Amino acid sequence: MLLSKYFLPVLKEEPSEAQVTSHKLMLRSGMIRQQAAGIYTWLPLGLKVLKNIENIVRSNMNKAGALEVLMPCIQPAHLWMESGRFDNYGKEMLKFQDRHDNTLLFGPTNEDMITDIFRHNIKSYKDLPKNLYHIQWKFRDEIRPRFGVMRGREFLMKDAYSFDINEENAVKTYNQMYQAYINTFRDLGVFAIPVIADNGPIGGNLSHEFHIIAETGESTIYYNKRFKTLKDNPNIDVEEIKSWYAAAEEKHDVNKLPISEQEITSSKGIEVGHIFYIGSKYSVNMNALINDEHGKLTPVEMSSYGIGISRLVAAIIEANCNEKGIIWPSNVAPFKVSLINLNIHDSKCVELAAKVYKELSAQNIEVLYDDTEARAGSKFATHDLIGSPYQIIIGPKKAADDIVELKNRKIGVIEDIEVENLIHYIK
């Protein structure tokens, strides 16, 4: 992509309305623009990150055996009345009437609707287990939306719902999805800690939250110091990870610790995922019954699995930035490489930049080629801000010898590389 053709409205100054780093950087780098309180337009750069995260989440759900569906944003209120949740959500739920005076709502979650889909289409234990997921926009009318997309009113979620014949099988599915979540965050290139948590209004008695460590987190989590080894060794067996102590603040009890208090540390965390074993709460209330192997009608056992995709964008930035801007993990970066031509009027620079751009593109490496008239300092500031993992810098002096500068955005090291060897460093 040529920067001269791209839509990248970067801001030089910090926006006064932004309170946290991720919100500031998302506005400054031209990822989002606010349309109303807690409601944002995703501009091209931000949308690329959102789609990259969405695709990684989707890939891991598919590998776990979940099947993708797409439920509507707008839901009939009678399903929520039937499940007993309609009055509990209060003013956070956006409700309205259509022209026929039917009460509708903008879905804040989907347990009620997926249970309705299940009960009308699956009747026998022979059709179980089933695990259905969708990726859809939601709305909760937060009384005080803040921190940009971290705590917005409109947000993108991945929600999965599993259905099993009994508790034993349901817990087995739950553990498989726990594994899928560990794999998902590894693939995203982020350090997420799974902590034992409350189920809240969803219901149920088994629950884990997944937190990214960040100073701006709203939750305090307590966890075994061994979790820090995941940063350097992400391939630790999931069963070992599950044996390590980690708990949300409301579940942490210093009098009931399985390890010494000296082995535990605490941090602020941003919740980016939450999985629940619900049991039969919704199936009983909504009559979602299955014929078991003895021909007896029994309520189906359910679990729910959420990942905040739009919130993940902000959380990843909070954990991966410095004073110059964002430092994207490679798998979610909007562009893996920023190609910076320092002199677009120098024929050798133009020739070399075109060659590099063509070779990287042929390898399906996403490149943002800065072919603008901007000064060198301005170009460096822009590309540090948007956070491409690599910057390839082409200037007249070194271009004459077919040499470019390669900057690793994360560690800040710049080295001279011969063009013919460049591809090996990027891959």
UniProtKB/Swiss-Prot annotation:
The keyword Cytoplasm applies. It is an enzyme of class 6 (ligase). GO terms for cellular component: cytosol. It comes from the Bacteria. It is found in: Cytoplasm. One of its GO terms (biological process) is prolyl-tRNA aminoacylation. Keywords: Aminoacyl-tRNA synthetase, ATP-binding, Cytoplasm, Ligase, Nucleotide-binding, Protein biosynthesis. SUPFAM superfamilies: Class II aaRS ABD-related, Class II aaRS and biotin synthetases. It catalyses: tRNA(Pro) + L-proline + ATP = L-prolyl-tRNA(Pro) + AMP + diphosphate. Belongs to the class-II aminoacyl-tRNA synthetase family. ProS type 2 subfamily. NCBIfam families: PRK12325.1, proS_fam_II. PANTHER family: MITOCHONDRIAL RIBOSOME PROTEIN L39/PROLYL-TRNA LIGASE FAMILY MEMBER, PROLINE--TRNA LIGASE. Catalyzes the attachment of proline to tRNA(Pro) in a two-step reaction: proline is first activated by ATP to form Pro-AMP and then transferred to the acceptor end of tRNA(Pro). This is Proline--tRNA ligase.
